[in-house]
C-alpha cells in the first residue's frame, strides 16, 4: 500500500509498523494523534499492557496505563469492527475519556465493537506487533522508539 498523509509509522523495538489512519471514521482522533506524533509524544513510550490473543496497548507517558497527554477526546464510535490489526483508542469508563493511549488488536475482538473508537489499521509490520512482549504489566517492555508521519519525511 502506498504511503499517504495518513500513514503513521511506529519504529518499535521489534521493527517498523505502518498504520493507515482513518480520518473518515474518527477525524478528531486522527488529528490529535498526528499532533502528538509531531510533538514527539510517543517517542520512547512503552507497550505497558499486552494480552496474548487480544491486544497491545501503548501511549501512557508513565508506562503504567494511568497517564495521558492531558486532552480528552470526544468518542467517535463507528461501525468499523475490531479485527486483527485494528488500531483503537483506549479509554476509562467514560466514553469521552480517550486521550493518548491506544491499542492494536492481535485477534478479532468483536466485543469491543461500537464501544471504542477505531481510528486505523496496521497496513504492514503486523509480524512485528506479534513479537511485542506480553504482560500486565510487561517486564522489560517493548516500546515505540520513534513515531512519525510517513510523508513528513518527504517534506
Where are these regions (language model features)?
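Cyclophilin-like peptidyl-prolyl cis-trans isomerases
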Residues: 1-155
Amino acid at each position: 500500500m502506498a504511503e499517504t498523509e495518513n500513514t503513521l509509522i511506529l519504529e518499535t523495538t521489534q521493527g517498523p509498523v505502518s498504520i493507515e489512519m482513518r480520518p473518515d471514521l474518527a477525524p478528531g482522533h486522527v488529528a490529535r494523534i498526528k499532533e502528538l506524533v509531531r510533538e514527539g509524544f510517543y517517542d520512547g513510550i512503552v507497550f505497558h499492557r499486552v494480552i496474548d490473543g487480544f491486544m497491545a496497548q501503548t501511549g501512557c507517558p508513565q508506562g503504567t496505563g494511568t497517564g495521558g497527554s492531558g486532552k480528552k477526546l470526544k468518542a467517535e464510535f463507528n461501525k468499523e469492527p475490531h479485527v486483527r490489526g485494528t488500531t483503537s483508542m483506549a479509554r476509562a469508563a467514560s466514553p469521552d475519556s480517550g486521550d493518548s493511549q491506544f491499542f492494536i488488536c492481535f485477534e478479532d475482538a468483536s466485543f469491543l465493537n461500537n464501544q471504542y473508537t477505531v481510528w486505523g489499521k496496521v497496513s504492514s509490520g503486523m509480524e512485528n506487533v506479534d513479537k511485542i512482549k506480553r504482560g500486565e504489566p510487561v517486564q522489560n517492555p517493548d516500546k515505540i522508539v520513534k513515531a512519525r508521519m510517513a510523508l513528513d519525511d518527504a517534506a
